[in-house]
Amino acid sequence: MAEQHGAPEQAAAGKSHGDLGGSYKVILYELENFQGKRCELSAECPSLTDSLLEKVGSIQVESGPWLAFESRAFRGEQFVLEKGDYPRWDAWSNSRDSDSLLSLRPLNIDSPHHKLHLFENPAFSGRKMEIVDDDVPSLWAHGFQDRVASVRAINGTWVGYEFPGYRGRQYVFERGEYRHWNEWDASQPQLQSVRRIRDQKWHKRGRFPSS
């Protein structure tokens, strides 16, 4: 369900990753198609290339989800990794801009329920769109523009995309407040689609099928 409102409303929670519960396991391979040297992780890794792998060519997520990054220390372009197989770099990079993956961490899914507020301007001002327990492949289709300058993730964990159809750079919103687009590491206030990240603890669907 997606609804629009004209004025901002009081925030629910402060920005916090909280404690990670449950089981996390990912297998990384140096070459494509799950070949070459491999390593298994069950916790965050700020630098894969320091001692584990020279590069990442393919990935198998056995339990998760995970958030991977283009650069060390959880920086750069973000890649959401849900349960499933990723035989090549372009299976996890919707933007197709970079084949680099140098750090990753488990994603905290704190609730089976999802609620997100999108705002046109920074500091939760301007036009507002509310999304509850739904995926939205096009904000335009719901009468909302592509400019999103601040976000409140009230329940659940979400991923937003630059373009419709879940394409382009990915931006993850864990429960909390994002007063300005630079707080989700975007260079401009552009989001055109958003969806829920769903843990198999509550949802058995597994990996989201990208278009």
From Swiss-Prot:
Record-linked PROSITE patterns: CRYSTALLIN_BETA_GAMMA (PS50915)
An example Gene Ontology molecular-function term: structural constituent of eye lens
Cross-referenced Gene3D superfamilies: Crystallins
Keyword annotations of the record: Acetylation, Cataract, Disease variant, Eye lens protein, Repeat
Impact reported for residue 75 to H: In CTRCT22; uncertain significance
Region of interest (Connecting peptide), ranges: 109-113
N-acetylmethionine modified-residue sites: 1
Region called C-terminal arm, residue ranges: 200-211
Region annotation (N-terminal arm) ranges: 2-23
Gene Ontology biological process terms, A to Z: lens development in camera-type eye; visual perception
Keyword Acetylation in annotation: yes
Keyword check for Signal: no
Superkingdom assignment: Eukaryota
Record InterPro entries: Beta/Gamma-Crystallin, Beta/gamma_crystallin, G_crystallin-like
N-acetylalanine PTM sites in chain numbering: 2
Domain spans labelled Beta/gamma crystallin 'Greek key': 24-63, 64-108, 114-155, 156-198
Its biological purpose: Crystallins are the dominant structural components of the vertebrate eye lens.
Subunit structure: Homo/heterodimer, or complexes of higher-order. The structure of beta-crystallin oligomers seems to be stabilized through interactions between the N-terminal arms.
Family: Belongs to the beta/gamma-crystallin family.
Notes concerning its domains: Has a two-domain beta-structure, folded into four very similar Greek key motifs.
Disease: Cataract 22, multiple types: An opacification of the crystalline lens of the eye that frequently results in visual impairment or blindness. Opacities vary in morphology, are often confined to a portion of the lens, and may be static or progressive. In general, the more posteriorly located and dense an opacity, the greater the impact on visual function. CTRCT22 includes nuclear cataract among others. Nuclear cataracts affect the central nucleus of the eye, and are often not highly visually significant.
Protein name stated in the entry: Beta-crystallin B3
Native species: Homo sapiens (Human)
Underlying gene: CRYBB3
